[in-house]
A protein has these predicted regions:
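Amphipathic alpha-helical segments within well-ordered protein domains
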Residues: 26-29, 44, 48
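Hydrophobic alpha-helical segments that drive targeting, anchoring, or assembly
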Residues: 20-21, 46-47, 76
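Short alpha-helical segments that sit at the start of domains
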Residues: 1-34
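Short, cationic-aromatic polyanion-contact patches
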Residues: 74-84
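Short amphipathic alpha-helical interaction segments
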Residues: 50-61
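A short, conserved structural fragment
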Residues: 64-73
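Short acidic, hydrophobic short linear motifs in intrinsically disordered regions
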Residues: 34-47
Length: 84
């Protein structure tokens, strides 16, 4: 399913349907280490590697989906799939 939206490990387009978008966001969220705080510039750099075209929307979707949280320019992972 994700192959339709990715090429060579990068996002080429975001799914329109929220359910598909959540699957893609879950994969992206795994780029962030649980328990670590990231400056906004770090988050932007990581997300640009995934989707250079519109990393700002990608960041907003991660927050809206409850996978990242933010405060005062800092972000941390709060959701998505975690490996035990």
């Amino acid at each position: 399913m994700l192959r339709a939206f990715t090429r060579e490990g990068r996002i080429v387009s975001l799914p329109a349907r929220w359910s598909k978008k959540l699957l893609l966001l879950d994969v992206v969220a795994q780029s962030f280490e649980p328990g670590r705080a990231y400056a906004e510039t770090e988050v932007n750099a990581i997300l640009r590697e995934w989707y250079e075209h519109d990393w700002v929307s990608l960041r907003r979707y991660l927050v809206d989906a409850g996978m990242l949280d933010r405060r005062d320019g800092w972000y941390w992972r709060i959701g998505g799939t975690f490996e035990l």
